[in-house]
Amino acid sequence: MELLESALAKIQPVDEALLAQAQAKLDNKTKPPGSLGLLEEMARRFAAITGDLSPKMGKKVVFTFAGDHGIVEEGVSLYPKEVTPQMVLNFLRGGAGVNVLARHAGAEVRVVDVGVDYDFEPTEGLIIRKIAKGTRNFAKESAMTREEAVAAIEVGIALADRAKAEGISMVGTGEMGIGNTSPSSAIIAAFAGCSVREVTHRGTGIGDQALEHKIKVIQAGLDLNRPNPEDPLDVLAKVGGLEIAGIAGLVLGAAANRIPVVVDGFISTAGALIACELHPNVREYIFAAHNSVEIGHQMMLQRIGAKPILDLQLRLGEGTGAALAMGLIEASVKVLNEMATFEEAGVTS
């Protein structure tokens, strides 16, 4: 709990004066004011977050957190939980979607085992920080203890602290965990007080009958556990996931260290939502990578006040959207740093 409390105490609002100064710098580039649209918003936010009007773009890292879910035993997913460790091994071999798109963006992928029901051999690119071998079935009991939830959050915070020490310029979130759309739907339903049906979709591609079953299972879990929306740790522990907790910690740690954090899709945003509920200033450090096909994602984004960069009908997770968005954010920073001013170009303003 000490690491979590320390991170929360360090999070400050982004400096409004820096945002204005970055915009003034952009307005002096050889273009009509505002003509690069959302690229300008990304550039000024990146500069203000880092506290540097000429931010250097060094290493970019996508942290893909992996964990299993007890709720899978209720038949809420198209795939068995054995796919979680199989996909982790695919990440480590460089063969997954996130690997391909991260390579394209010039980003590194680091896989974090925070709760997979499998014992991995130590491998390059794998960070083993296992809190438990998956969550428990939240349709029957609490997914985690409060202590487990905090421990998983602190895994993410520690990784953000290490990223700062390494000089990493931007971090992205990703995840792998069969069944993890169910806790994500439960989390937003708990905070928003909405019906489970409003925020639950097909995940990996389940049919109509399976979707109805999934909705009933999630509702049963919420009815049983009664998570307190005024207590984010209670929501996380009762109906969340270990990888979701790890993502929440990475987002909190990024905000505490003034590192821009690119949040992927539905499950990653569930983690970001926990972080924002723990500290309202966290949202100022988040770049929402994309608008997911999962219907609960829009409600999450509205709640944290985030505007998605991309809308490509993505629903894979892993950090794929984050990797893609990183390239656009980097492009926006290059505009801020490399585009000529009117004076430099000899152009009349």
UniProtKB/Swiss-Prot annotation:
One of its GO terms (molecular function) is nicotinate-nucleotide-dimethylbenzimidazole phosphoribosyltransferase activity. The active site is at residue 318. It comes from the Bacteria. SUPFAM superfamilies: Nicotinate mononucleotide:5,6-dimethylbenzimidazole phosphoribosyltransferase (CobT). Its EC number is 2.4.2.21. Pathway: Nucleoside biosynthesis; alpha-ribazole biosynthesis; alpha-ribazole from 5,6-dimethylbenzimidazole: step 1/2. It catalyses: 5,6-dimethylbenzimidazole + nicotinate beta-D-ribonucleotide = alpha-ribazole 5'-phosphate + nicotinate + H(+). One of its GO terms (biological process) is cobalamin biosynthetic process. Keywords: Cobalamin biosynthesis, Glycosyltransferase, Transferase. It holds the Pfam family DBI_PRT. CDD domains: DMB-PRT_CobT. NCBIfam families: cobT_DBIPRT, PRK00105.1. Belongs to the CobT family. Catalyzes the synthesis of alpha-ribazole-5'-phosphate from nicotinate mononucleotide (NAMN) and 5,6-dimethylbenzimidazole (DMB). This is Nicotinate-nucleotide--dimethylbenzimidazole phosphoribosyltransferase. It comes from Geobacter sp. (strain M21).
